[in-house]
Amino acid sequence: MSGPRAGFYRQELNKTVWEVPQRLQGLRPVGSGAYGSVCSAYDARLRQKVAVKKLSRPFQSLIHARRTYRELRLLKHLKHENVIGLLDVFTPATSIEDFSEVYLVTTLMGADLNNIVKCQALSDEHVQFLVYQLLRGLKYIHSAGIIHRDLKPSNVAVNEDCELRILDFGLARQADEEMTGYVATRWYRAPEIMLNWMHYNQTVDIWSVGCIMAELLQGKALFPGSDYIDQLKRIMEVVGTPSPEVLAKISSEHARTYIQSLPPMPQKDLSSIFRGANPLAIDLLGRMLVLDSDQRVSAAEALAHAYFSQYHDPEDEPEAEPYDESVEAKERTLEEWKELTYQEVLSFKPPEPPKPPGSLEIEQ
């Protein structure tokens, strides 16, 4: 094995060799998942702490290669304060022939909403600020034509100033794509995805926001189902059984027959579940946790709800450029995905590092 690339160094962490630029110092493992492992580090160029994700076997198969390309392109496309941003992407390879590793550098966030809910009871002001930011990020993502599909507390990062960013777009898919059944952690999953009822739309993410908001308000999950059937039962105990109009929209005959076999349940008054909560919070929840996805509020509509009157500013809730999915919708070979990914790595322009304090702008 030859030595590290010029300007890079190697370090073994959790039985994995990392090869990173010398400006990334003090690598410390912070977690790992199916798609890669993450270290925190100090970036001497950006003068800030960052998260470095090493993708695991990015080109192991056609599916891996397409997912790698997609994740990189999505991260490059999305630039918003409430969405995790790409600070850098690199590979130790110096040619396409050696290209087998991809590292993504993003903002380091301290905690996720899971940690926050476990550690402290949140005030109504906290909940307002967190859910406002979540919806602000979601409005931006949705305006690009992207559905996240996997929103849950562990995918929502928060720093010590209560600033929030949405993470993990590995599973996000374009809005007009054929939809399949198995993606998010079940408790936060909209019923139409969970049971493969019908083609779904961006409001699946709004259902997830409703579940997250409910958890922030009461300190525990709203629908902690033990399996699909239990999950559906818990949902219907709160929102009631679907009306004939909603049933008619369910394309799965199996799901329709099953729901019709259940005893009818009335919709519960949410204020009886969230005792003492701000009535505006309860009103907003009631607009998000709606079985009929056509009747759920959009992210943009939710931002204008009176619950966020302290924060809502239509001039400061930006939208994204549309995301062009045609490139990744095509059938390609593994080598072609790899080549496209390599081009995306090479064409990335990192953000400008901060100017040292006291430095003067010099006119060229």
UniProtKB/Swiss-Prot annotation:
One of its GO terms (cellular component) is cytosol. ATP binds at residues 30-38, 53. The active site is at residue 150. The TXY motif contains the threonine and tyrosine residues whose phosphorylation activates the MAP kinases. It catalyses: L-seryl-[protein] + ATP = O-phospho-L-seryl-[protein] + ADP + H(+); L-threonyl-[protein] + ATP = O-phospho-L-threonyl-[protein] + ADP + H(+). Serine/threonine kinase which acts as an essential component of the MAP kinase signal transduction pathway. MAPK11 is one of the four p38 MAPKs which play an important role in the cascades of cellular responses evoked by extracellular stimuli such as pro-inflammatory cytokines or physical stress leading to direct activation of transcription factors. Accordingly, p38 MAPKs phosphorylate a broad range of proteins and it has been estimated that they may have approximately 200 to 300 substrates each. MAPK11 functions are mostly redundant with those of MAPK14. This is Mitogen-activated protein kinase 11. A motif (TXY) lies at residues 180-182. Residues 311-331, 343-364 are annotated as: Disordered. Keywords: ATP-binding, Cytoplasm, Kinase, Nucleotide-binding, Nucleus, Phosphoprotein, Serine/threonine-protein kinase, Stress response, Transcription, Transcription regulation, Transferase.
